[in-house]
Amino acid sequence: MLFLLSPAKSLDYDTPVPTEVPATQPHFEAPRGPSAELIKLLREKSPQQISELMHLSEKLSALNVARYQAWSGKGTPKNARQAAFAFDGDVYGGLDARSLTPTQLAWAQEHVCILSGLYGLLRPLDLLQPYRLEMGTPLANRHGKDLYAFWGARIAEHLNQRLAADRTPVVVNVASQEYFRSVDRKALKARVVECVFEEWKGDRYKIVSFYAKRARGLLARWAVLHKAATPKALEKFDLEGYGFDATASTAERLVFRRKFG
């Protein structure tokens, strides 16, 4: 069973990573691979073009143009850091990779995947060079008008390879719709289970973006801590007050709810 997460816009290359944490190379990051092909396209654009393409400020555009120029075909401890430690945002606050033991990180490496506009798919310990390229970016390429066309069935096919040894392949989607859309459902040979997180607001339950993002990371963390092997096992998820709501759920859509106070 694999868990899919979205990446984060904000990055942390300052907080030290424990020295005993190993590092691996991303699957699609060969010098002439898909990631390098995208970097080549991005390097052809000016800061103003990047600003318009990604709706960034002048300062952020200049920063990312510099990042594209500095990007190399292979991440090293000097120019990159492990994805689960580099991404910094609500999801990764919930995951809290720094508090996981080496054994837990090893399990996460086998069962947690991070979708990425530039890298396609990352494992938590894959080396990540600084970048900005959201999956929804309309970056024209030889495959089509955007990154969904660029990645095509490649992400789904790689997931199939990762799941090939599982008797009943399952993908647990705790990524945003923008990112999960990059997984070609027709090519994916696995059952997909979606997890939804709702808060009690006023007189009903509803999804609150900030809390939902953190909850996605929390669920991935819980799965790592408990080595969750089936969707049924996820029904016991209970971090930070969430509980499984059987009446609101289906076999393919697990709903977790909580009330404050």
UniProtKB/Swiss-Prot annotation:
GO CC annotations, alphabetized: cytosol
Disulfide bonds: none
Stored Pfam families: H2O2_YaaD
GO biological process: response to hydroperoxide
Domain of life: Bacteria
NCBIfam families: PRK02101.1-3
Family (UniProt): Belongs to the UPF0246 family.
Protein name as catalogued: UPF0246 protein Vapar_1301
